Amino acid sequence: MTITDLSGRWEVCLDESKADALPQKYPDRINLPDSTSNAGLGALNTEMEYGCLTDLHKFEGFAWFRREVEIRPEMSGKNLTLFLERTRKTRVYIDGNQIGEYCSLCTPHRYDLTGLPAGKHELIIRVDNTDYPTGGGHLTSRDTQTNWNGIVGRIELQSYSAYPEYVYAIPDPDKKTLHVRAWIKGAHCGTASLRVFDVTQEYGSAAAEFSDEKPLECDIKLSDSAPLWSDSDPAPLSLELDLDGDRCTVTTGLRRMSADDRTLLINGRQTFLRGKHDGLVFPQTGYMPTDVDSWLKFFETLGEYGINHVRYHTCCPPDAAFEAADILGIYLQPELPFWGTVPDEFGAEHKFLREEGWRMLREFGHHPSFVMMSMGNELWGSKERLNELIAGYKAEFPDKMYAGGSNNFQFVPCVLEQEDFFSGVRLGRDRLIRGSYAMCDAPQGHIQTERPNSVHSYDPLIDEAAALAGTQVIDENGEIMIQYGTEMKKVKAESWDNISVHVPVISHEVGQYAVFPDFDEIKDYTGPVRHEAYAAYKKGLEDAGMLHRWKDFFRASGALAVDCYRRDIEAAMRSSMMSGFQLLDIQDFPGQGVATVGILNAHMKSKGLVTPEEWRRYCAETVVLAELDRFVYSASDEIECGLLVSSTEPGFSAEKILWELSVDGTVVDSGASDIREQKGRIYRAQSVSFTISCDKPTEARLHVSVEGEAENEYTLYIYPNIDIEITENYISGGGKRIEITHDPETAKNGGALCIPTSDENSLPGEYCTDFWCYGMFKSISESMGKPVPTGTLGLLIDNKSELLKDFPCDTFTTPQWYEIVSHSRCADLDGTDIEPEVWVIDNPERRKRLGLLYRKDGAVCCTSRLWEIADRPEVKWFAYSLMEYLGK
């Protein structure tokens, strides 16, 4: 094949009116590949977006691109193809004559220009980013990569005698064979030579005939030395087809992803997906890159945080992403660009989607990293049509694992006959398989509702034969109110609470723990998009007199979010019946209300909240886990601790789990516990127990490890026994007593603690940080008639305050605050300049001044109802610290 690169200078005409006639003038210029917005073309967008990024040169309509191309004499008489790697709807003209039009949102556009005579010709490409045949999901959404217009990948003239338009290889790692199928263009019949190799050697070869009537098809037997491909040992192979001098090389690999009941296997051994959601968010350009180096950098960053899997939400990345994932060992799950209801009979939209799926499989299916595929996001409608769709793909491309969608049917999930894995958030109304949910999707998860612990497992919920029926979910008409995209809708429902799942279970969109924005990121938006929401939040915080605290809010909320993610991930790691999770997200999501839920910002840069090494302690191929039913203890408690390892590492052979308990850097107890039981990837050791003596509140560190493999650490909060009484009227102990009053005036002169009665402006205390983003789910809850989210982001604590002198703590939320927060209503201090000792961090959209412990007009005020939790050791010491200060 001879390639003529058409990248470079093109003339442009932008037409929002979408006139069908060829333009008379092309007033602008652009260097393709690029988008019109990134090139700064079109009018400046004066409409600022606050629920997503603002595209400074937003353009929707026809973009006409023109340039001269030359067909050299040696190209004349050969087959000639115009190749456009990634674009929108296109139409092509040569010398003023329409050649054709094409619509694929996920795959290259190819135009047959065979027969074009030698010489110079006018080439015009019209790109239309309106009226797509489907909604497009994250492929065309302003919430992710923007609805760009342009051509953002390779632009080429390809000339050849014969060439495979598509090449597909079905690997059989057991037999060490590749079954190759190729669709040949340009020759009526012939013989192709095939060989498989890598940089070190050739592993096999074959010859195969082809004709117009049938594709090329053959088996290539590989040598025993041919390596297998997996996440832990990626070994991509090159497959070359030689068609009488016209050569084509694609990447393939020997791998099989399969299932044994609920266990996910790679090449016959267990694997576990440590995944992230991805919507192709690249704010620097507003569209995804199409070069391998950019994707290597992207996946290498993910690998630093232990991620081995990416689920593409209603989108499909370009070939370069698969190529990079092949090299680094990342499991990819592209998805049809659809988010909605599947009809009983396919109309134009679903016929397009079906064909788009075929195009995705034929274009990218040879890549070993392409292991899974989903039919869309949160689908409703016809199970029969979904089954048929999967069955068709599976018959031709059997080496993929398929799901009817991600989190289909929501409250009433099912497993379709053709599905190879289940991706969802629940197996019934109360069978919850992730740690957090929006209020409109209640009941909420264990991270939101349980005292912090490290024992929660999803196994009883996955294995449960029957679940409690959600009597309040399905109405008398058999309908259910659900979140539908970013809005709400009623759909027909069936009762599937008793489903039994015997395919791998993948937890969908895990996390969504909000972090206060990092306003320093504003300066990073130097491309075609701006973060106007951040600017608005910053101005609003300044108007509220709290801008000086934003970095503190950011760090404190971030520390809590990291801990929430950790406990959610560890719950999945502990669950032997779980086969993986897909985080939403370690990367911020700049749309759908602006969801700052990442430990990385939208540019994939670290926020400085957690190091990769710290994150990999609980998100890696091998993770050591301690099981503790709580993290707060009395000094007299005997602490029971389970010890286990989750490992899918080939050759894992540890025999013991080592544990070490330290206080103030001094080891006070240690041991080695024999691994006695294995259940799949879970290796369980003998439990241990210990006590920690102390005469003052103490933090202890429990360090667990397996020699040479992995380590983890847990913080325990230990409180000595103290003789203190807490009632609704007083706190007393050690000969001291302070009164509790509900009137700040009474507490002005000291000697009394004000615990004010809640008013309509106070908010319920919540330990966990907000889910996703306040604005979006407040709107959805109101539309559904459901409770609105509280919307707070944890605590910011002045841990040097005299009020907390006898209650040592950090500056952010930790488990010792769980009971105190959960039994409080935070005070609304708007209109004051009070700087609380314990702030409750509000979300940046509402940005109220909220306090749990603060001073007002000389009175010390605490909004926690301490008498309700008077038996808790940490509460006794918190009350003691307040009493010591107020009793002076």
Where are these regions (language model features)?
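Active-site-adjacent substrate/metal-binding segments within catalytic domains
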Residues: G42-E70, K78-T81, R88-Y93, G100-C103, ...
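Beta-strand-rich binding/interaction modules
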Residues: V92-I94, T177-E209, L216-C218, D637-D674, ...
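Substrate-binding/catalytic cleft of secreted carbohydrate-active enzymes
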Residues: H309-L600
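Aromatic-rich peripheral "rim/lid" segments of glycoside hydrolase catalytic domains that contact
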Residues: E396, L584-S647, I657
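Catalytic beta-strand/loop cores that center a nucleophilic Ser/Cys/Thr
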Residues: D459-K489, K778-P873
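Short alpha-beta junction capping motif
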Residues: Y730-M776, D857, C862, Y885
